């Protein structure tokens, strides 16, 4: 159990970091496209 946490924690952290960094510019683009028109 502890070994599974040690193995998966860095993987989950890396995935969360990647998703966060992908969504941030995408969300800014979304706001620029949809909220900026009106």
From Swiss-Prot:
One GO term under biological process is:
photosynthesis
Q: Name one GO molecular function term.
A: manganese ion binding
- Keyword annotations for this protein? Membrane, Photosynthesis, Photosystem II, Thylakoid, Transmembrane, Transmembrane helix
Instruction: One GO cellular component term, please give it.
Output: plasma membrane-derived thylakoid membrane
InterPro entries, per the entry: PSII_PsbY
Task: Describe its membrane topology.
Answer: Single-pass membrane protein
Q: What is its main location?
A: membrane
Q: Where are the transmembrane segments?
A: 4-22
Q: Where in the cell is it found?
A: Cellular thylakoid membrane
Keyword Transmembrane carried by entry: yes
Q: How does it assemble?
A: PSII is composed of 1 copy each of membrane proteins PsbA, PsbB, PsbC, PsbD, PsbE, PsbF, PsbH, PsbI, PsbJ, PsbK, PsbL, PsbM, PsbT, PsbX, PsbY, Psb30/Ycf12, peripheral proteins PsbO, CyanoQ (PsbQ), PsbU, PsbV and a large number of cofactors. It forms dimeric complexes.
**Family the entry assigns:** Belongs to the PsbY family.
Function comment: Loosely associated component of the core of photosystem II (PSII), it is not always seen in crystals. PSII is a light-driven water plastoquinone oxidoreductase, using light energy to abstract electrons from H(2)O, generating a proton gradient subsequently used for ATP formation.
Q: What is this protein called?
A: Photosystem II reaction center protein Y
Q: Which organism is it from?
A: Prochlorococcus marinus subsp. pastoris (strain CCMP1986 / NIES-2087 / MED4)
């Amino acid at each position: 159990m502890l070994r599974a946490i040690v193995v998966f924690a860095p993987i989950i952290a890396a995935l969360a970091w990647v998703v966060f960094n992908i969504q941030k510019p995408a969300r800014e683009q979304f706001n620029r496209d949809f909220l900026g028109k009106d």
